[in-house]
Amino acid sequence: MRARPQVCEALLFALALQTGVCYGIKWLALSKTPSALALNQTQHCKQLEGLVSAQVQLCRSNLELMHTVVHAAREVMKACRRAFADMRWNCSSIELAPNYLLDLERGTRESAFVYALSAAAISHAIARACTSGDLPGCSCGPVPGEPPGPGNRWGGCADNLSYGLLMGAKFSDAPMKVKKTGSQANKLMRLHNSEVGRQALRASLEMKCKCHGVSGSCSIRTCWKGLQELQDVAADLKTRYLSATKVVHRPMGTRKHLVPKDLDIRPVKDSELVYLQSSPDFCMKNEKVGSHGTQDRQCNKTSNGSDSCDLMCCGRGYNPYTDRVVERCHCKYHWCCYVTCRRCERTVERYVCK
């Protein structure tokens, strides 16, 4: 009996969704670049793991950027693990780059977050590197056109966000511009989420000031535009992750677009993370779906949040254990000017999931 055409189409679409989805974040493997690799010659670009040919070309033509890109990859790893430390999915699989598990291989909510964070991180790192004078191709950001406010004056060195966004997008979006990398739906999803990450970075630009005046009177303040820390951007993106929208690839007019699965009468909002495939609950270990499980994960007995023992342990229960903590105590200030402390030890009770 021959399969019906619509069944075949559905199977092909499902297969496409599972193929090559994480191609755009393989560059995070740069976090493992040996410090001994100088990255001062173009032939070094071929030795870097996780890059597509377009990124290798960008490396060769912008060699001075690569230390900053490596730094960005390392910052993504740290920021993701910190942001999800209290969740069942704790971003541990990101450290397997470039050989990800299915939690990041597929078009999941988790991959949406990592794409957004990666795009934000590389632009953030480049913008900051311009400010610190580490890149010969850029300097401080432009002086804002609006007045700084009473008692303030523009000065200092602003983070060069425009240059960071330009060069960051060229590098992080390059894999999605390659023709043979998965389905069109996946490409649209990845590009959309990367732009959401850059949007979150733009929103983090704020006025920072330094006081001047006699005896700290702060009669005049020198101000500039600076980016928040990447961890703050990650926190913003985590909020968007929690409210991410599941989408489908459907015709709208003469072209196909990503539209919300449960409300396909409107286009996807520019500010929302989107995903194509639902994730497992990450309760049990199952590498087929990219789940490490939560067995032996630490939980908080008194919390009502995602790190609570009830939620983290998925109802399986938990085991208590005692831990000895050494900390500074009985600190005393001495004139002038130092502090002495004693070292105290106390026992705390902790809990891990069964």
UniProtKB/Swiss-Prot annotation:
Signal peptide: 1-24
One Gene Ontology term of the molecular function aspect: protein kinase activator activity
GO CC, alphabetical: cytoplasm; extracellular matrix; extracellular region; extracellular space
Gene name per UniProt: WNT11
Pfam families for this protein: wnt
Entries under Gene3D superfamilies matching the protein: 3.30.2460.20
Sequence similarity: Belongs to the Wnt family.
Biological processes, Gene Ontology terms: adrenal gland development; artery morphogenesis; atrial septum development; bicellular tight junction assembly; bone mineralization; canonical Wnt signaling pathway; cell fate commitment; cellular response to mechanical stimulus
Principal subcellular localization: secreted
Name of the molecule in the record: Protein Wnt-11
Organismal lineage: Eukaryota, Metazoa, Chordata, Craniata, Vertebrata
Biological source species: Homo sapiens
Residues of this chain annotated as glycosylated in UniProt: N40, N90, N160, N300, N304
Keyword Nucleotide-binding recorded: no
